[in-house]
UniProtKB/Swiss-Prot annotation:
Entry's family note: Belongs to the EPSP synthase family. MurA subfamily.
Enzyme class (EC, first level): transferase
Main localization (coarse): cytoplasm
Residues with the 2-(S-cysteinyl)pyruvic acid O-phosphothioketal modification: 122
Gene Ontology MF: a single term: UDP-N-acetylglucosamine 1-carboxyvinyltransferase activity
Organism: Rhodospirillum rubrum (strain ATCC 11170 / ATH 1.1.1 / DSM 467 / LMG 4362 / NCIMB 8255 / S1)
E.C. number(s) listed in UniProt: 2.5.1.7
Taxonomic path: Bacteria, Pseudomonadati, Pseudomonadota, Alphaproteobacteria, Rhodospirillales
Gene of this entry: murA
CDD domains: UdpNAET
Catalytic reaction(s) noted: phosphoenolpyruvate + UDP-N-acetyl-alpha-D-glucosamine = UDP-N-acetyl-3-O-(1-carboxyvinyl)-alpha-D-glucosamine + phosphate
Name the UniProt record assigns to this protein: UDP-N-acetylglucosamine 1-carboxyvinyltransferase
């Protein structure tokens, strides 16, 4: 099992190109199931989860062709579902990645049936799919749970409906939106998630011929159409990768230029960084992060749905706050059990106490390298940031989590002065 070795203590200095958003790409890939025309996605990140989704679609009979490699324009994938032969998403693939549930809505909407294994791929508390299923039932789908599978079917077409989500759900919004594009009549989706990845999905669907109003707001109005066409669509920049490398600059008191990204994707994080003492400047085609001349100050955060502070940045923020002046409170309001990185940070000398859904972080003079273990994707990169800031050597075990969400992380950091290498057993 791969490990990552880091010798920390040196400030980062250089340029990192931000890739396409993993969460957007995983949502966009299933749109091919809504049409018999080719769909091309560009600016695609090269990640394990992307390959898993491609394998899942391929097993259903979708033509999948991945191209490109290290080019600055990013990879692209050609998808063709005209020869779809199966509407089952099997356990052996779905268990690796919960985003697999996003094939459910498109399959039912266009093909009238789907059999999808209950998802896996994440160790962050309970992430139920009941809101996905209730939304599809509201559109007329018949849902049964049998032997670990979701069985969904509809006679004829789905029917438009008014759906008000009881709480904001990203995946539920995405599944309902895709299904509604081919439903008969109008669908009103209220209290929807407003993440940039959902805006990206809606813009892609609109380019395919979907009739969607309210993009970027909390209410989406969808007028169903008979068919959708193909399209070519560039995946939105990855705001979580953007934020992670911005925090890497802060953690090491360094300077990084991030290209291929946008300020509007990370405004909440940037606001918190500036309050902590980091200089963030919007430049053409990206951002410049400069933490060289300031002693960072502890700043409280509470995770919230977009446009609030993202839950996927909580662990990384904690790593930075571990060496900031004073104390900070980090409150996790989205997922339960998302402080699994705290014991590992504590092994490196961090002073953190958990009280319910909040963690109190008291900044220390410095962290020390140690043997640590990654428990999930964001905890993995949190430990990378802590190791970059720490004195001495850190070995991070179980980094397969890291490969699910970050492309060539060791190469990008090494190019900016980090002493980092992957150890293969």
């Amino acid at each position: 099992m791969d490990r990552i070795r880091i010798v920390g203590g040196a400030p980062l200095d250089g340029t990192i190109r931000i890739g396409g958003a993993k969460n957007a790409a995983l949502t966009l890939m299933p749109v091919c199931l809504l049409t018999d025309q080719p769909v091309t996605l560009t600016n695609l990140p090269d990640l394990a989860d992307i390959r898993t989704m491609a394998a899942l679609l391929g097993q259903m009979g979708v033509g999948t062709l991945l191209n490109g490699a290290e080019s600055s324009a990013g990879r692209h994938i050609d998808l063709d579902a005209s020869g779809l032969s199966d509407t089952t998403a099997p356990y052996d693939l779905v268990r690796k990645m919960r985003a697999s549930i996003l094939v459910l809505g498109p399959l039912v909407a266009r093909h009238g049936r789907a059999r999808v294994s209950l998802p896996g791929g994440c160790a962050i508390g309970t992430r139920p799919v009941d809101l996905h299923l209730k939304a599809l039932e509201a559109l007329g789908a018949h849902i049964e749970l049998k032997e670990g599978y979701i069985h969904a079917s509809v006679e004829g077409r789905l029917k438009g409906a008014k759906i008000t989500f009881p709480k904001v759900t990203v995946g539920g919004t995405e599944n309902a939106l895709m299904a509604a594009t081919l439903a008969e009549g109008e669908t009103l989706l209220e209290n929807v998630a407003r993440e940039p990845e959902i805006t990206d999905l809606a813009l892609c669907l609109r380019a395919m011929g979907a009739k969607i109003d309210g993009i970027g707001t909390g209410t989406l109005r969808v007028e169903g159409v008979d068919t959708l066409g193909g399209t070519s669509h560039a995946v939105v920049p990855d705001r979580i990768e953007t934020g992670t490398y911005a925090l890497a600059a802060a953690a090491t008191r360094g300077r990084l230029t991030l290209t291929g990204t946008r300020l509007d994707l990370v405004e909440s994080l940037v606001d918190h960084l500036r309050r902590a003492g980091v200089v963030v400047t919007a430049i053409e085609g990206g951002l410049e992060i400069d933490a060289r001349t300031s002693a960072l100050t502890g700043v409280d955060v509470m995770t919230e749905p977009f446009p609030g502070f993202p839950t996927d940045m909580q662990a990384q923020w904690m790593a930075v706050m571990s060496t900031a002046r004073g104390a900070s409170m980090i409150t996790e309001s989205i997922f339960e059990n998302r402080f699994m990185h705290v014991p590992e940070l504590s092994r490196m000398g961090a002073d953190i106490n958990i009280h319910g859904g909040s963690a109190i972080v008291r900044g220390v003079a410095g962290l020390s390298g140690a043997q640590v273990m990654a428990t999930d994707l964001r905890a993995s990169v949190c430990l990378v940031l802590a190791a970059l800031a720490a004195s001495g050597e850190t070995i991070i075990n179980r980094v397969y989590h890291l490969d699910r969400g970050y492309e060539r992380v060791e190469d990008k950091l090494a190019a900016c002065g980090a002493t980092i290498e992957r150890l293969r057993d």
